[in-house]
């Protein structure tokens, strides 16, 4: 058992959240560089000579320079073993991002210092609030002209409702960016440009009152001392207990592109972020140091290897230890399975996992039996809770250019819906197929993947659907009557759950008034 505890205590599992273009994929690259996982970091829209960013490994992502799927990367840093989950920054992929946030113990929030708190960041922070996830903040892009740092922190506090404790502080910005002052260590780290792709020694000056500071940065030294007087009086001190409750965020400044300040964030995550936490189930709380293995699936990714049409289920280990060849109990279908070929990840590069501990993410080969939200144990029957499905906000009817490929279309759509890329609805009264998504880009992705992976050419048509709700009723007779009277608005989703497809919000509200015994749910547990 003590061996298990040592491994659990080493783990730090976190995700990076941000508004699109705040620099999240770049920071992922630099974090991996510090973890020795990459020798030279790639940039997303690199020059011809630049490498493609490691975490954007799907063809469509490489073409567009955006992160669409969730990548998982593991690397050692500072005596810890860090699991980084890179989430899609593009606003159209919030469902996938949301589910990823159920698999981590802390988050790194990246903010563009020229723009401040943006809409997508606000939405993602609402999600982290549901589980009081601890948040570390990185104010990025100091190599550009930025807003006043105190204003930035005020905005985070007022808009995101979380106290800010500055750990590092910028000295100048844009062309005048000189470096950062580490408040807790009382040292200035000087900035040099052109070092973004590698790790090199930086010049460090110990002590804010060190005369060497004037020699290095001139009048900025006196400005820094004045600013620090103000900052110390106006901001919160770091409080570890408040951080762990999600009430306070340590704030770091830097530039991911210039690879400056990223090591400070990693130091903070290793020192302060929680080790793997207990997890709720429908029967009890599962502790990470329990002897028996448990885990849950938070994502399914199809076709990670275009050479083999495969699907991989991403599982967060919650307790015990995975060993190659072990027997697991797949709770939902009530079957035992031997797992000898689970995977670990380095963003698309996969290796066979010999062992895994709580906080680790492993991949299980999935031949159509595993769904998002599935629980695996060593025999105990319970279900981990808190992996939700959201009602889509946009709908299209999908049809084929070649009607003979209906079977392939349905297979492709069901697989993509199980993976969480899109939701599929089959109306009870017609042969239509309706696709639901959170944003327009998802529709494009689905058509692209149907063509490249299933050889199916599909096109969309508009459809008068405003929203969808999952419907439940404890009284079987009333549910049957509802089905009979409202069949023109009912459909089955990809998991055969009964769904109400509302043409307008007015229609939905009227139906909710007319059938008070029926529950119309906006979210559904997987």
UniProtKB/Swiss-Prot annotation:
Give the source's domain of life in one word: Bacteria
User: Does the keyword field hold Transferase?
Assistant: no
- Name its GO BP terms in alphabetical order: regulation of translational termination
Sorted alphabetically, the Gene Ontology cellular component annotations on this record are: cytosol
Q: Where in the cell is it found?
A: Cytoplasm
For this protein, the record's SUPFAM superfamilies field holds: EF-G C-terminal domain-like, P-loop containing nucleoside triphosphate hydrolases, Translation proteins
User: Could you tell me what this protein is called?
Assistant: Peptide chain release factor 3
Q: Which organism is it from?
A: Shewanella baltica (strain OS155 / ATCC BAA-1091)
């Amino acid at each position: 058992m003590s061996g298990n505890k040592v491994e659990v205590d080493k783990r730090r599992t976190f995700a990076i959240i941000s508004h699109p273009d705040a620099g999240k994929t770049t920071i992922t690259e630099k974090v991996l560089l510090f973890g020795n996982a990459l020798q030279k970091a790639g940039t997303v829209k690199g020059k011809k000579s630049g490498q493609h960013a490691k975490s954007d490994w799907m063809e469509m992502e490489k073409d567009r320079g955006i992160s669409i799927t969730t990548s998982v990367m593991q690397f050692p840093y500072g005596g810890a073993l860090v699991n980084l989950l890179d989430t899609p920054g593009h606003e159209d992929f919030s469902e996938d991002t949301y589910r990823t946030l159920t698999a981590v113990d802390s988050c790194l929030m990246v903010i563009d210092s020229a723009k401040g708190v943006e809409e997508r960041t606000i939405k993602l922070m609402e999600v982290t609030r549901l589980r009081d996830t601890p948040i570390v903040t990185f104010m990025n892009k100091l190599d550009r002209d930025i807003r006043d740092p105190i204003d930035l922190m005020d905005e985070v506090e007022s808009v995101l409702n979380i106290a800010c404790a500055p750990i590092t502080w910028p000295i100048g910005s844009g062309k005048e960016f000189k470096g950062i002052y580490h408040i807790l260590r009382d040292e200035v780290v000087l900035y040099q440009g052109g070092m973004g792709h590698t790790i090199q020694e930086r010049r460090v000056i110990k002590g804010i009152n060190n005369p060497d500071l004037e020699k290095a940065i001139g009048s900025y030294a006196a400005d820094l001392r004045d600013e620090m007087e103000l900052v110390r009086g106006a901001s919160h001190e770091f409080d570890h207990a408040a951080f762990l409750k999600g009430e306070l965020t340590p704030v770091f400044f830097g530039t991911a592109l210039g690879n400056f300040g990223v090591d400070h964030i990693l130091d903070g995550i290793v020192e302060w972020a929680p080790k793997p936490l207990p997890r709720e189930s429908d029967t009890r709380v599962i502790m990470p140091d329990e002897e028996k293995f448990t885990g849950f699936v938070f994502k399914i990714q199809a076709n990670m290897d275009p050479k083999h049409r495969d699907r991989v289920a991403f599982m967060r280990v919650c307790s015990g230890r995975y060993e190659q060849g072990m027997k697991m109990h797949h709770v939902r279908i009530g079957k035992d399975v031997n797992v000898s070929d689970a995977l670990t990840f380095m963003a698309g590069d996969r290796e066979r996992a010999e062992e895994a501990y709580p906080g680790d993410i492993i991949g299980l080969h999935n031949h159509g039996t595993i769904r998002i939200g599935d629980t695996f144990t060593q025999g105990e029957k319970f279900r981990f809770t808190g992996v939700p499905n959201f009602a889509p906000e946009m709908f299209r009817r999908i049809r084929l250019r070649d009607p003979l490929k209906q079977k392939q279309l349905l297979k492709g759509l069901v697989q993509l819906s199980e993976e969480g890329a899109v939701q599929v609805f089959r109306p009870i009264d017609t042969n239509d197929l309706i696709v639901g998504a959170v944003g327009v880009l998802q529709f494009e992705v689905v058509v692209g993947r149907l063509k490249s992976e299933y050889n199916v050419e599909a096109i969309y048509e508009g459809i008068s659907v405003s929203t969808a709700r999952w419907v439940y009723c404890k009284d079987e007779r009333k549910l049957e009557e509802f089905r009979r009277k409202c069949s023109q608005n009912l459909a089955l989703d990809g998991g055969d759950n009964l769904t109400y497809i509302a043409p307008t919000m007015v229609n939905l509200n009227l139906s909710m008034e007319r059938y008070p015994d029926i529950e119309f749910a906006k979210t559904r547990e997987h």
